[in-house]
Amino acid sequence: MTTVRRLRPGDAPSYRALMLDAYARHPDAFTSSPTERSALPLSWWQARLAVEPLAKEIVFGAYTGEGVLCGATGLSFETREKARHKAQLFGMVVLASHRAHGVGAALVQAALAEARSRPDLRLVQLTVTQGNVSAQRLYERFGFVPFGIEPMAVAVGEGYVAKVHMWCDLRAT
């Protein structure tokens, strides 16, 4: 059984390890690289998980019955006056050994529940690597629809990958 909860500063070591592994294994899925993120001190990761009333980011973690962090995703909230109605889903990762078991769905569901609990939010946006059909289908199940493709969005090695931009209207049922 998987449990999803908001991560806190004390979860920073396991969250950092999960994300660094994801950056290394799936360089096309993330804009950050393992080199740049591994150089950040643990305090940076703890700050990302800070629990504050007006936090600019919230990160959710999925835990196995044994207490192992097997997935994570985050919501980033716009602070600029004209864009406060938007949030960004970011950093979605599920360990390969836990995929196709509902972990990703539970994480997206938790993030959208948090977004819907905020009366000023109207939409959530995300990007997914073009060609990652399983991830795109997961997001579509929760009401996300594509609205554009960003060519050459992320440099990977000598090449580039495109990102599909998607959005979810929180006003829809």
Located regions from the model:
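Acetyl-CoA-dependent GNAT
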Residues: 9-10, 16-17, 22-91, 95-97, ...
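Residues that form or flank phosphate/diphosphate-binding pockets in enzymes
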Residues: 14, 84, 102, 134
